[in-house]
């Protein structure tokens, strides 16, 4: 019986029928205006915005942000308000390779200023030390310079390596010439008679 009632019902589609939508419009037009306002008031929600502001955005809430109470860094303008003091690059002309090479050549023999200051300050410190401590300090500084002077160490290592290679080449040449001479003597010994070999042995001993 359930199968027979299901077959008598019309199948409803997914799309709305034009007749059903027009009938609902007609019905809504026939209703008085007051009932429409009641329906809208039932469907809509009213928000208490002041309550929301008080709940979600209270005045004392910090939202996890840090408050920095320290004063901002003061700005100090340059000492000397001369226009020339602002930039040296504006007044200087472009550096040419020739002038740069001359300056480098002139500065090559001189030590940097910071090293001169270090030597002056170390001289003042040395006056407080005993002669033994001065000698110990001098030896330490010399060893430190030797240890950290990598350029000199690399040059020395290259010289030693080239010297070793040159010595090895000479040894190989000498061994090759010695091998060649021994082979020549062996060949000559093989070509001679046993009596000649005995004479050669007696002469060599």
From Swiss-Prot:
Coiled coil: none annotated. Residues 80-91, 121-130, 167-179 have a biased composition (Acidic residues). Residues 147-150 are annotated as: Required for binding PPP1CC catalytic center, displacing metal ions and inhibition of PPP1CC catalytic activity. GO terms for molecular function: protein phosphatase 1 binding; protein phosphatase inhibitor activity. InterPro entries: PPI-2 (IPR007062). One of its GO terms (biological process) is regulation of signal transduction. Residues 17-26, 182-205 have a biased composition (Polar residues). It comes from the Eukaryota. One of its GO terms (cellular component) is skeletal muscle myofibril. The keyword Oxidoreductase does not apply. Residues 1-46, 64-205 are annotated as: Disordered. The keyword Glycosyltransferase does not apply. The modification N-acetylalanine is found at residue 2. Pfam families: IPP-2 (PF04979). Residues 35-46, 110-120, 131-143 have a biased composition (Basic and acidic residues). The modification Phosphoserine is found at residues 44, 87, 121-122, 127, 130. Phosphorylation on Ser-44 by ATM activates PP1 by dissociating the PP1-PPP1R2 complex. Phosphorylation on Thr-73 by GSK3 activates PP1 by dissociating the PP1-PPP1R2 complex. Keywords: Acetylation, Carbohydrate metabolism, Glycogen metabolism, Phosphoprotein, Protein phosphatase inhibitor. The modification Phosphothreonine is found at residues 73, 89, 92, 96. Belongs to the protein phosphatase inhibitor 2 family. Heterodimer with PP1. This is Protein phosphatase inhibitor 2.
């Amino acid at each position: 019986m359930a199968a027979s009632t299901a077959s008598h019902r019309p199948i409803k589609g997914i799309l709305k029928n034009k007749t059903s939508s027009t009938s609902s419009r007609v019905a809504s037009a026939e209703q008085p205006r007051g009932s429409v306002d009641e329906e809208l008031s039932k469907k809509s929600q009213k928000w208490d915005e002041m309550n929301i502001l008080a709940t979600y955005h209270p005045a004392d809430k910090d939202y996890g942000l840090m408050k920095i109470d320290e004063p901002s860094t003061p700005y100090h303008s340059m000492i000397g308000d001369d226009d020339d003091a602002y930039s040296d690059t504006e007044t200087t002309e472009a550096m040419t390779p020739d002038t740069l090479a001359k300056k480098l050549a002139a500065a090559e023999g001189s030590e940097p200023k910071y090293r001169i200051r270090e030597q002056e300050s170390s001289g003042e410190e040395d006056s407080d030390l005993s002669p033994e401590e001065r000698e110990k300090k001098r030896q330490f500084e010399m060893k430190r310079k030797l240890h950290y002077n990598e350029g000199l160490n690399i040059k020395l290592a290259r010289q030693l390596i080239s010297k070793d290679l040159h010595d090895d080449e000479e040894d190989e040449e000498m061994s090759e010439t010695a091998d060649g001479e021994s082979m020549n003597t062996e060949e000559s010994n093989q070509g001679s008679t046993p009596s000649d070999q005995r004479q050669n042995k007696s002469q060599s001993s």
